[in-house]
Amino acid sequence: QLLQIFAGVRPVSALVPGVLGTTGVESAEIVQSVVEATRPDRVVVVDALAAGSADRLCRVIQVTDAGIVPGSGVGNSRAAFSAETLGVPVVAVGAPTVMDARQPGEQEPLMVTPRDVDARVRRLSSLISAGINAALFPDWSYDEIAQFVDL
């Protein structure tokens, strides 16, 4: 049955570049190198975001063609992922998993997450993955996508 599902499927690559603190290399530099080598039609970038209010924490998913600047929501901006920097259209997908809870008058940021953030991130990642698969493979049914995504 898998061969039948994959018949006629467009080629798609996946990459998890890691973060600078782990790899020693900017994520955008890794992605840029892969883009130059593989020449994709577009790049889909997924990242965590910072929420402006608690009611949005792990409850919304943002999709944009404007790109994304990792770390910008927590004051640690890294190199941008955008059409300008990568040379191909970029679809950026993100969900807010942290927020700044500093009190008025405090200078230092206080980043907080929900107590059950791990479970929420697992659910968000399943939803985002299903959405990306539905967009990339519009002929697939919900059941076919669910075979590959924990829905």
Task: Give names to the regions the model predicted.
Residues 26-30, 38, 119-127:
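Conserved active-site and cofactor/substrate-binding residues in soluble primary-metabolism enzymes
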Residues 60-115:
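Glycine-rich phosphate/nucleotide-binding loop
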